[in-house]
Regions:
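Catalytic nucleophile loop
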Residues: 99-102, 125-145
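Catalytic-core regions built around general acid/base machinery
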Residues: 90-94, 115-128
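C-terminal and late-domain segments of enzyme folds
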Residues: 2-33, 39, 44-55, 59, ...
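Structural preference for alpha-helix termini/caps and helix-kink/transition segments
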Residues: 270-357
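Charged helix-capping and loop-helix junction motifs
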Residues: 55-56, 87, 112-119
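Portal/gating segments that form or line small-molecule/metal binding sites
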Residues: 44-100, 107
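General beta-strand structural signal in soluble alpha/beta enzymes
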Residues: 10, 70-73, 99-100, 131-134, ...
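Glycine/threonine-rich flexible loop motifs
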Residues: 105-115, 186-189
Length: 357
């Protein structure tokens, strides 16, 4: 694992706009080819048009950046610690670039905070890999997550959701506020990511946090390797602490210590180790093995020798599960094999297989 942190880009909005293509390109060009890029779809997982959003983002990377970004899907809390969840974890662990973007900040934080997604994102940055978080996903990166929909649309009294505190790795104690300069409200204040200055002031009174505001169509790029940060795009980055408000203009690169000094760490630090007791049970470990084998089959099915070895491992695992009368997971393996065009035939003490004609 690298001793240097990776580069993280935080976008206030406009993740697929022409204005910020260069930000994606900058992070991708730092990575040796072939780039293993994955999109995490959690923030918009609840939306009816989730599939269309996935296609839009994949088309953007394909057409604008000549990169095939693959999907690491986790859209519902009911998927937590299932085979599909562990498959997503395995994909993200292999990634050297992760993208997450639009949707609901609070929905994303509920899916990510205090489970293995959080640990995986921390490890991703720690190993020197790069990530780009935009809009809703960006809001989760600090100590708190701003529940925009609940406050602005529903009218719930201002409150904080828990954040990932991923920026704590860079020595920054803050809450991230994208859409900082939003003016869509016209005759009412929609700055501070739509909630407005008055409601943000109430939030600060309830539970104080330094603020890291990022204007729309603007990116903050933090380099762990260079120990610098850069502002890019149409707007600026605003830092608010107990003493002052500072503005960092687009087109400038600064020493990271400048940001660290103005967003100094609070006394309430996030635990470095996340409680992962739930993932240690036998069922979860079996699902994890199945997920990893499924990924390997998908990636290596053109290689006949490796393909046969992987199928044999799945067959052996299925036989073991049948002997333990764990028919539900045994049938799950059968479904995986059959979806890969493999026919299996059960007998009392063995399982045979062949590729369907």
């Amino acid at each position: 694992m690298s001793n240097q942190l990776g580069t993280i880009a935080i976008l206030g909005s406009g993740e697929t706009s022409p204005n910020l293509v260069a930000v994606h390109r900058k992070l991708l060009q730092e990575i040796p080819k072939p780039v293993k890029a994955y999109m995490l779809d959690s923030p918009f997982g609840f939306q009816e048009n989730a599939e269309q959003l996935v296609e839009k983002i994949q088309d953007f990377y394909d057409l604008s950046l000549n990169i095939k970004i693959k999907l690491a899907s986790y859209r519902n809390i009911e998927e937590l610690n299932t085979k599909s969840f562990f498959k997503t974890i395995s994909l993200l662990e292999k990634a050297d670039f992760i993208f997450a973007g639009p949707g609901s900040p609070s929905y994303a934080s509920k899916l990510w905070v205090n489970n293995e997604i959080e640990e995986t994102l921390f490890n991703h940055i720690k190993k020197g890999a790069n990530a780009l978080f935009a809009s809703a996903a960006a809001t989760t990166l600090g100590e708190n997550t701003l529940p925009v929909y609940e406050i602005y649309k529903v009218g719930i009294d201002p409150y904080w959701e828990e954040g990932l505190d991923l920026l704590g790795l860079y020595g920054l104690s803050c809450t991230v506020v994208p859409h900082f300069n939003n003016r869509e409200g016209g005759n009412h204040d929609t700055s501070f990511s739509y909630v407005g200055k008055n409601r943000m002031s109430k939030l600060m009174e309830i539970n104080y946090s330094n603020l890291l505001g990022i204007d729309e169509h603007t990116a903050l790029i933090i380099s762990g390797k260079e120990n610098t940060f850069e502002v890019y795009g149409l707007g600026q980055v605003t830092v608010i602490n107990e003493d002052k408000t500072l503005e960092f203009k687009s087109g400038e690169t600064y020493d990271l210590t400048t940001l660290q000094n103005h967003l100094s760490k609070s006394h309430k630090d996030k635990p470095s180790e996340i409680n992962q007791e739930a993932k240690q049970n036998k069922s979860d470990e079996t699902l994890r093995k199945i997920a990893n084998l499924e990924i390997q089959i998908e990636e290596n099915e053109s290689n006949n020798k490796i393909f046969k070895e992987l199928v044999t491992q799945l067959i052996d695992l299925r036989l073991k599960l049948r002997s333990e009368k764990n028919y539900e997971m045994s049938d799950m393996i059968r479904d995986i094999l059959e979806s890969s065009n493999i026919q299996i035939e059960d007998s009392t003490d063995k399982i045979e297989w062949k590729i369907k004609d």
